[in-house]
Swiss-Prot record:
Origin species: Thomomys bottae
Gene Ontology biological process terms from the UniProt entry: mitochondrial electron transport, ubiquinol to cytochrome c
Family of this protein: Belongs to the cytochrome b family.
Subunit record text: The cytochrome bc1 complex contains 11 subunits: 3 respiratory subunits (MT-CYB, CYC1 and UQCRFS1), 2 core proteins (UQCRC1 and UQCRC2) and 6 low-molecular weight proteins (UQCRH/QCR6, UQCRB/QCR7, UQCRQ/QCR8, UQCR10/QCR9, UQCR11/QCR10 and a cleavage product of UQCRFS1). This cytochrome bc1 complex then forms a dimer.
Major localisation: mitochondrion
Other facts noted in the record for this chain: Heme 1 (or BL or b562) is low-potential and absorbs at about 562 nm, and heme 2 (or BH or b566) is high-potential and absorbs at about 566 nm.
Gene name tied to this protein: MT-CYB
Name the UniProt record assigns to this protein: Cytochrome b
InterPro entries in alphabetical order: Cyt_b/b6_C (IPR005798), Cyt_b/b6_C_sf (IPR036150), Cyt_b/b6_N (IPR005797), Cytb/b6-like_sf (IPR027387), Cytochrome_b (IPR030689), Cytochrome_b_C_euk/bac (IPR048260), Cytochrome_b_N_euk/bac (IPR048259), Di-haem_cyt_TM (IPR016174)
Record GO cellular component, one term: respiratory chain complex III
UniProt KW keywords: Electron transport, Heme, Iron, Membrane, Metal-binding, Mitochondrion, Mitochondrion inner membrane, Respiratory chain, Transmembrane, Transmembrane helix, Transport, Ubiquinone
Subcellular location: Mitochondrion inner membrane
Length: 380
C-alpha cells in the first residue's frame, strides 16, 4: 500500500515540496534564508491581522488607534512591535537571500530569479504603504515625498499623483487606500512565493559549487527540515531580543508625533531598509533622473543573468569576482548610511560616488572580472 503522503492529491503536493524533495547534499547555511523569509511572512500576516482588528484607517483616529493598541489591548504592544520590527527582519533576510543568489550564481535560474525580483518590488511596496498607516510625522511626510516622485513622469505625472492621493494632498482617502493595499499585498506575495518555489523545484536548488548534483541528492526531510528549524529558532531568539529590549531602535522618533501638514520634520527619510535606494535617488540633482536611477537600482538585478560572462557559475573559486562582490556589499552599506544623512557636503559627493560605483560594479566590473578569470584559467 502506498504511503498516504505519496498518494493523497493534497498531501502529495506538500510531500514533493517539503519532504521527499531531492536536495543537493552540500548546501550551506546561506540557503536557510528562503525558509526564514516564509517564516517572516507568516509572522507579518498573523500580527498584521490582529493589528487590523483594532486599527482605524482615518486621519483623525489612526494615530490614536495605534496608541490604543499599545496601551489598552492585551499584548498589543508586543504585536505592534513584532509587526514593526518584523519588517526589518524580513528585509534583512531578503537582502541576504538576494546576496546569496548573486554570490553563488542562482540568478541563472531566470524564471525563479525574475519572480524573486517581482517579490522584492511587492515587498517594498507593502512596507512603504504600511509605514504610512501609524499617521505620525514621518509617515505623512514620507508618503508625501515618495508619492510626489511620480509627478516627475512626463505629461501624466501630476494626474497620476492626484489619482493615488485621491485628492490634492495626502489625506483621508490616501490613508484608507494605503490600508487596503497593505492588507491585500501580503496575500499576493504569498501566492507569488508559491510560484517562486514552483519554478525552483522545476530546476532543483543550486549549490555552493555551482555544479549539477543530480547524482547524489538527498531528501529534504529530515536533513534540511532540521537545519531550517535550527535557523528559525536562532532568528526568533535574535528577533525577540530586538522586540523586547530595543523595540524603537530601528524606528524614527518623529513618528511618535502625530502628522501635521503644517510642520515639516528637519530630515525626511524612509525606514533603514530603503535608505540605499533613497541615497541613489538623492544623488542625482534632476527629479526624473533620480526616479529612473531609483527604479534601475532594483531592476538592474534582472540583467544579472545576461551579464554573466564567467565559465563558472559560483563565485566560490573566483577571487576577483569575490572582491567585487564584497566591495558591492560595502558600497550598499555606505549608501544606507548616506541615505540617513542630511543633503550637505561631504555627504553629497560621497553619495554620488557610491551610486556610480554601485552601477559600475554590476554593469561593467563584474562581467569584466568574469572574462579576466576565464583568461587566467586559460578557458577559451
Amino acid at each position: 500500500m502506498t504511503i498516504m503522503r505519496k498518494s493523497h492529491p493534497l498531501f502529495k503536493i506538500v510531500n514533493h515540496a517539503f519532504i521527499d524533495l531531492p536536495t543537493p547534499p552540500n548546501i550551506s547555511g546561506w540557503w536557510n534564508f528562503g525558509s526564514l523569509l516564509g517564516m517572516c511572512l507568516i509572522i507579518q500576516i498573523l500580527t498584521g491581522l490582529f493589528l487590523a482588528m483594532h486599527y482605524t484607517s482615518d486621519t483623525l483616529t489612526a494615530f490614536s488607534s495605534v496608541t490604543h493598541i499599545c496601551r489598552d489591548v492585551n499584548f498589543g504592544w508586543l504585536i505592534r512591535y513584532m509587526h514593526a520590527n518584523g519588517a526589518s527582519l524580513f528585509f534583512i533576510c531578503l537582502y541576504i537571500h538576494i546576496g546569496r543568489g548573486i554570490y553563488y550564481g542562482s540568478y541563472l535560474y531566470k524564471e525563479t530569479w525574475n519572480i524573486g525580483i517581482l517579490l522584492l518590488f511587492l515587498t517594498m511596496a507593502t512596507a512603504f504603504v504600511g509605514y504610512v498607516l501609524p499617521w505620525g510625522q514621518m509617515s505623512f511626510w514620507g508618503a508625501t515625498v515618495i508619492t510626489n516622485l511620480l509627478s516627475a513622469i512626463p505629461y501624466i505625472g501630476q494626474d497620476l499623483v492626484e489619482w493615488i492621493w485621491g485628492g490634492f494632498s495626502v489625506d483621508k482617502a490616501t490613508l484608507t487606500r494605503f490600508f487596503a493595499f497593505h492588507f491585500i499585498l501580503p496575500f499576493i506575495i504569498t501566492a507569488l512565493a508559491t510560484v517562486h518555489l514552483l519554478f525552483l523545484h522545476e530546476t532543483g536548488s543550486n549549490n555552493p559549487l555551482g555544479i549539477p548534483s543530480d547524482c547524489d541528492k538527498i531528501p529534504f526531510h529530515p536533513y534540511y527540515s532540521t537545519k531550517d528549524f535550527l535557523g528559525a529558532i536562532m532568528l526568533i531568539m535574535l528577533f525577540m531580543i530586538l522586540v523586547l529590549y530595543f523595540p524603537d531602535k530601528l524606528g524614527d522618533p518623529d513618528n511618535y508625533t502625530p502628522a501635521x501638514p503644517l510642520n515639516t520634520p528637519p530630515h525626511i527619510k524612509p525606514e533603514w531598509y530603503f535608505l540605499f535606494a533613497y541615497a541613489i535617488l538623492r544623488s542625482i540633482p534632476n527629479k526624473l533622473g533620480g526616479v529612473v536611477a531609483l527604479i534601475l537600482s532594483i531592476l538592474i538585478l534582472a540583467l544579472l543573468p545576461y551579464l554573466h560572462t564567467s565559465n563558472q557559475r559560483s563565485m566560490l573559486f573566483r577571487p576577483l569576482s569575490q572582491f567585487l562582490f564584497w566591495t558591492l556589499v560595502s558600497d550598499l552599506l555606505l549608501l544606507t548610511w548616506i541615505g540617513g544623512q542630511p543633503v550637505e557636503p561631504p555627504f553629497i559627493i560621497i553619495g554620488q560616488t557610491a551610486s556610480i560605483l554601485y552601477f559600475a560594479i554590476i554593469l561593467i566590473l563584474m562581467p569584466l572580472a568574469g572574462l579576466i578569470e576565464n583568461k587566467m584559467l586559460k578557458w577559451k
